[in-house]
A protein has these predicted regions:
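Bacterial N-terminal signal peptides that target proteins for export
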Residues: 2-11
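Acidic/His- and Gly-rich active-site-bordering loop/insert found
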Residues: 8, 23-133, 152-161, 340
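Hydrophobic h-region of N-terminal signal peptides that target proteins for export
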Residues: 13-22
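Sec-exported extracytoplasmic/periplasmic mature domains
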Residues: 34-42, 63-71, 147-154, 187-188, ...
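An extended, acidic, His-containing surface patch that forms the Zn2+-binding/catalytic region
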Residues: 76, 92, 204-205, 264-327, ...
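Acidic/histidine-rich catalytic neighborhood of metal-dependent amide-processing enzymes
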Residues: 129-217
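A short core secondary-structure module
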Residues: 176, 180-181, 240-264
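Short amphipathic alpha-helices in soluble, non-transmembrane regions
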Residues: 245, 353-361
Length: 471
């Protein structure tokens, strides 16, 4: 029965794809993105939820709707589901450029489905928006890059240096089977890239109080990350005769200590540059303080760390995300544990974070265990190099009024797996978010405007041309 269902699902997919392929010129870029969003390419740590049929149907869909790209570029599938495109340039002496993306998405929680204006995998299109999981993170990027390549190939464009696209299939769960395997493949080819561009930075509006202009934040670095299980084992027993402290009590006190004593805050070079760039756009008092940063350093750090958003730019942050303990109402818990999700700022390390937690909790009953993969912070790409100039100039040409600033990305991307392949790794997508829409990323009602999606295709088209001309 399961095999029959699988065969019917595949047949349905092939029929739909055949219809799409039959009229490629009449299928707009908006409809192609909408269809791409309908493939539920969901990443989850629970491997039993993985549906290989959906992933393979999505790959087949790309081959049908971008025929020139798949005819003229060398196309390779790595580890069954991750995709590599090789666009041969005319000058073999020039170092290649690499564009990264991923087509897997996070789940839409069942408890939130009624709150969506349109189902998360419907790809619904209205007069203004395209709705669905992946419209910002990150399926839109894969589609926009392939739209750009298809457009340029129709114009008989050939880049001067080699250009690669690499699209992972498991970025949302660490990229260990996708980006990591692709990077290993590139290493066997002895590839080094002049520039790598991934997600991570974004355009923001009305996020910084007092600044009305849109700001393009290009991430020149990203934090490291790790998950730690902090656990306590204590004797069990009946709740009618409790000890002074149960395992949950001990663990709770450890959590409170960590909250009261966060990792130290400091200004890293990208954040200093960002404050210098933004200073002229703030009100008088803020502008004066930022221009005299050394004099007001403590006050600036205090102000920034008091804000939830900017606090993450100045320090390693430790978040409690999952809690376990106890199995029965009247039984004392022998075991209690909490997951600590850590985002590590440049200057800190996995080892220094572990030392901090042990020092602050200061209790031999509290044990720490590193979970799954973990990564130290990335290196920092210079904001005055060729890669930065080409990217920032392309942004400026498309959005003349925009402010452009470096950023330390608080999250992690697939780019961390490529760190040994380039000294110039930048992270940016041409999408604008404000205080409301930023909650839609991994949240409810994820969407992208039709105008902005079309502009993102134009942006990548011009960026590829500019890299070819100026690199």
């Amino acid at each position: 029965m399961q095999q029959l269902k699988t065969n019917l699902f595949l047949l349905k997919g092939v029929l739909l794809l055949s219809i799409a392929a039959a009229q490629p010129e009449r299928t707009s870029e908006i409809q192609r993105l909408s269809k791409a969003l309908q493939f539920e390419t969901i990443s989850d740590y629970d491997s039993s939820t993985f549906n290989p049929v959906v992933y393979k149907n999505f790959i087949y869909y790309l081959q049908q709707v971008f025929p020139l790209t798949h005819q003229k570029l060398e196309f390779r599938i790595i580890n069954e589901y991750s995709l590599v495109y090789y666009w041969k340039g005319t000058d073999a002496k020039r170092a290649p450029a690499l564009f990264l993306g991923h087509y897997d998405v996070v789940p839409a929680e069942a408890s939130t489905l009624k709150q969506w204006s349109h189902p998360p995998f419907s790809g619904y299109i209205d007069n203004e928006w395209i709705w669905g999981r992946g419209t910002i993170d990150n399926k839109f990027l894969v589609m926009a890059l392939l739209e750009s390549a298809e457009k340029l190939l129709k114009e008989n464009f050939t880049p001067r240096q080699d250009i690669y696209f690499a699209f992972g299939h498991d970025e949302e769960i660490g990229g260990e089977q996708g980006a990591l395997k692709v990077a290993e493949y590139f290493k066997t080819k002895n590839l080094e890239f002049d520039m790598i561009l991934d997600e991570g930075g974004i355009m923001v509006k009305d996020v910084f109080p007092g600044i009305t202009k849109t700001i393009a934040l290009i991430a020149t670095a990203e934090k490291g990350d790790m998950n730690i299980e902090m656990s306590v084992f204590e004797k069990g027993g009946h709740s009618s005769v409790p000890p002074k402290e149960t395992s949950i009590d001990v663990l709770s006190k450890a959590i409170l200590k960590l909250n009261k004593h966060p990792m130290p805050a400091r200004l890293q070079q990208p954040t200093i540059e960002m404050l210098n760039i933004l200073a002229p756009h703030f009100d008088g008092k803020t502008r004066f303080a930022l221009r005299h940063r050394r004099l007001f350093r403590k006050k600036i750090i205090k102000k920034l760390t008091d804000n939830q958003g900017t606090n993450a730019l100045l320090r390693t942050v430790i978040s409690t995300t999952m809690l376990r303990g106890g199995s029965k109402e009247n039984s004392l818990p022998t075991f209690a544990a909490v997951n600590l999700n850590v985002r590590i700022l440049q200057g800190d390390s996995i080892e220094s974070v572990m030392q901090h937690i042990y020092k602050i909790t200061n209790d031999p009953r509290v044990q720490l265990t590193l979970k799954r993969s973990y990564h130290n912070p990335s290196s920092i790409t210079l904001s005055n190099g060729k890669a930065w100039q080409v990217l920032s100039n392309t942004i400026k040409e498309n959005w003349p009024d925009i402010i452009i600033s470096p950023l330390v990305a608080p999250g992690t991307t697939d780019s961390r797996h490529y760190s040994s392949l380039s000294k110039n790794i930048l992270r940016f997508i041409p999408v604008t978010v404000d205080n409301e829409s930023k909650e839609q990323i991994h949240g409810i009602n994820e969407r992208i405007s039709i105008i902005e999606y079309r502009k993102s295709i134009l942006f990548y088209t011009e960026l590829i041309k500019k890299i070819s001309a100026e690199f």
